[in-house]
Amino acid sequence: MAAKEVKFGDSARKKMLTGVNVLADAVKATLGPKGRNVIIEKSFGAPTITKDGVSVAKEIELKDRFENMGAQLVKDVASRANDDAGDGTTTATVLAQSIVNEGLKAVAAGMNPMDLKRGIDKATIAIVKELKGLSKPCADSKAIAQVGTISANSDNSIGDIIAEAMEKVGKEGVITVEEGSGLENELSVVEGMQFDRGYLSPYFINKPDTMVAELDGPLILLVDKKISNIREMLPVLEAVAKAGRPLLIVAEDVEGEALATLVVNNMRGIVKVAAVKAPGFGDRRKAMLQDIAVLTGGTVISEEIGLSLESTTLEHLGNAKRVILSKENTTIIDGAGVEADIQARVTQIRQQVADTSSDYDREKLQERLAKLSGGVAVIKVGAGSEVEMKEKKARVEDALHATRAAVEEGVVPGGGVALIRALQGINDLKGDNADQDVGIAVLRRAIEAPLRQIVANSGDEPSVVVDKVKQGAGNFGYNAATSEYGDMIEMGILDPTKVTRSALQAASSIGGLILTTEAAVAEIVEDKPAAGGMPDMGGMGGMGGMM
C-alpha cells in the first residue's frame, strides 16, 4: 500500500480552497449572455471550445493532490446539478465557490464548522421553499422558446426550434439531437410509433421510388416467437385474404419456408403483406410488443397466455391507418387503440420511470413513453465546422434539458434575480445559536454571487447592479445582454425553477462538506527513476573494408 500524506485543519482547508477557486474561476468565465468561451486541449484532434460549465469542470485535474480534492468536490457540484436538471452547472459552481470562501473566513474566525453547516442547510431549505412560491407554470410555446434561448447562451434559433419540436410531439415526446449536414438547424418529426426494425425482405417493397413498403389500413399480427412453419399461419392468412386488407406481421423472427411463402403471396397479389422483427430484446421486446398491441387495439399472440397462431382470429389483430416500412425503420401511424387503454399504459410506464435506478432503463422507458404519447422529433444541428458543431450540439442539449425542467417545475425570473428575491425567505430566519446565524449569513452573501458574476462578465460594476436589483421588487432585474433594467419575464429572461433549485441544493451540500473537513489524506507520489537504457554495443570491428 502506498504511503499517504495527511494535512490537518487550516492547512488542509487552504489547499482545498485553492483547488476550488482554480476550477470555479475557469467555469464561471462562461456565465451569462456575455460569458466567454473556454478552450480545452484534446489528446488528439482539434481542441474543444465550449461555454458549457460541466464540460469545463470535467476536464480539470490538478497536479497537487490536496488542491485536486477541492477541485473534484466542486466538479461533483456541477455534475449533480447536471444530473438533476440537465443545466445550471455554472450557477451551482459559482454558488459553491462563494459558500466555501465565505464559510472558511468564518471558520478561521473561530466559528464551529458543524453549526455553520446547519445554518447553511436551514437557509437553503427556506430559500428553496421561497423559490417554489415565486415559480410560474411554463405553459406556452413563447415561454418554452425563451427558456431554451437563455440556456443556449441567448441563441434565439435554438430556443425557437426546441419550442417547435415540443409543440409537434408534445411535452412528453422524445426529442433527440443529432449532428446535421448543413449550416442551419433542421427539425424533422416522426408521427406515430416508430421502431428501429426494417422489412425482412426487400420483396415486400411496393414503392420502388422511395424504397419503402407502405400498407394502407393494415391488420397487424403481433407474435412473440419465431415463425418458420407456414402451416401455423394459414388460418390467419386465409381470414386476412377474405377481408381484403393488407397485413403487417411483427414477430421475433420470420424465416425459411414461412418468409418465402409470404414473399410469394405478396408478389402474386394474393395477400398484401410485410413482415418485420419485433423491436428490442428479451423482456424489453415483450414490453414493446405489448405497447404496439395497446396502440393498435390488438393482442400479442403468446403461448404464455394460451394463444397460438393456429387459433388466431381477426379479433386478435390490431389496426392502423397506415404503416411504412423502410430498410431500417417501421412506423405505425394512427393506431386504432382505445384511448383509455393507451393512457393506462402510459401511466404504468411513468411509474416504472419513477421507480428505476438505471439511467439506461430510464432512457429506454422514456422512449417507449414518447412513442405511445406523441411521436419523435429530431433536431439536426447545423454548423460551419466540426469544432463549432460540437460546441453548438452541447448547447442545444443543455437548452433541451432546461426546457424540460421548465415544463416540469415552472419558471422564475432569470439572470440571478430569482435567488435575490428568494432572500426574503430568510429575512427573519434565526439559527439555534450565533454560529448557525453566521451560517445563514454566509448563504445570504453567496446567493448574490451568480448575479455578481453575470454582471462582471458583461463588464459592468457588480455592487452597483446588485444594490439596484435589491431595491426593486418582483421581476425587476438587470438584462446583462443589453445593460438595461426592467421586468425579466417581459424581457424573456427566464430560468427553470428546477435548475435554480438544483444548483442551490448541490452547492450548499458540497460547500457545507468542505467547511466541515478537518483532515485530508492523499497518496504520496513517488518519483520513479527512469528505466535504464540499452547497454553500449561497442564498435563492430572489422567493418572498415566494407566501403
UniProtKB/Swiss-Prot annotation:
Keywords: ATP-binding, Chaperone, Cytoplasm, Isomerase, Nucleotide-binding. CDD domains: GroEL. GO terms for cellular component: cytoplasm. Coiled coil: none annotated. It is an enzyme of class 5 (isomerase). It is found in: Cytoplasm. It comes from the Bacteria. Its main location: cytoplasm. InterPro entries: Chaperonin_Cpn60_CS, Cpn60/GroEL, Cpn60/GroEL/TCP-1, GroEL-like_apical_dom_sf, GROEL-like_equatorial_sf, TCP-1-like_intermed_sf. It catalyses: ATP + H2O + a folded polypeptide = ADP + phosphate + an unfolded polypeptide. It holds the Pfam family Cpn60_TCP1. SUPFAM superfamilies: GroEL apical domain-like, GroEL equatorial domain-like, GroEL-intermediate domain like. Its EC number is 5.6.1.7. One of its GO terms (biological process) is protein refolding. ATP binds at residues 30-33, 51, 87-91, 415, 479-481, 495. Belongs to the chaperonin (HSP60) family. Together with its co-chaperonin GroES, plays an essential role in assisting protein folding. The GroEL-GroES system forms a nano-cage that allows encapsulation of the non-native substrate proteins and provides a physical environment optimized to promote and accelerate protein folding. Forms a cylinder of 14 subunits composed of two heptameric rings stacked back-to-back. Interacts with the co-chaperonin GroES. This is Chaperonin GroEL. It comes from Pseudomonas fluorescens (strain ATCC BAA-477 / NRRL B-23932 / Pf-5).
